[in-house]
């Protein structure tokens, strides 16, 4: 509590222009343990004007003309405490706060002899003067933020401290927005460009390389090289030597630009992406050894249906058909499952004549008198060789044997 006599706080002598002004450290008790927040419900008496007010470069406030719990650091009421709040959430961010803010007395009447400017001392060092006794009877108050909005206005501008965390979070949020939406190519952070359809249809390229080059121009070679360099250094730092560094950029095939929140949703689950990867360049012709050169290769990752719709895949060749558009097996050619009569005869051989059965098989296909069980031209030797997976060479008979002789021997 302040003494009852006002002369102990501020003498009634006017300050001459040549005399040094009073310091801020002589008016406020600098002990941080003896500080107590100023109550917002306490006001000054109408007969006394406020002691002095502040003018900061952060908020612009005018000194109150009527008694109000505004920016008042002292009062003449003996029931009020002349102590600002030690830890306010609206602290200045600059440590040179006392060099940028000045304290001034209100000027209601020019005839008042005590109206003069007060400049606070830059260092806030603990000092005690005989004009102000040490306030040791005040209870210790914890450093906490005011619970009412009125306390916020009545407890500001105390001592230099660190910048509030709200300003740092706001700056980080702007940086995060800029990194998030910088893919759109906008000049200002946080501004998202609209998805404007491109003048050229992606289906007109008909080449994945040409479409990839058009997307690279919109994205920028310098940015791709920077991102790929960072990814390569990250792989080397983490020891991922087995994985090739590949940078993927989601793209929009409507505006032919990197994808932004304003672009329409892709039709497929995996949207189109532009791939960038390091590529080893060949040496110069005529030089066996030289410096290692690394380039950047590009590719597109598209769903198969979307790539086929954009005519980026080679067309499939139609299957070869016969002259009349029919299956070759319908013309009377034997199929692999078809067995000629010689094969049927081999399936049921005579009990004692295996060699005669083999000769019958070889002679049955070569003799002109053998019966035919299918219509159409006779099968050719090369085509029959293609139908059987592994044709066995038949042993040539030592002498020509007629069909009648073979039948007579088999019946005995």
From Swiss-Prot:
Q: Which Pfam families match?
A: DUF4679
- Highest taxon of the lineage: Eukaryota
Annotated InterPro entries: DUF4679
- For the region Disordered, what residue ranges are annotated? 33-75, 123-174, 318-412
- The annotated regions of Low complexity compositional bias extend over 126-142, 334-350
Q: Where is the composition biased (Polar residues)?
A: 33-45, 353-372
Q: What is this protein called?
A: Proline-rich protein 30
- Tell me what organism the protein belongs to: Macaca fascicularis (Crab-eating macaque)
- Tell me what gene encodes this: PRR30
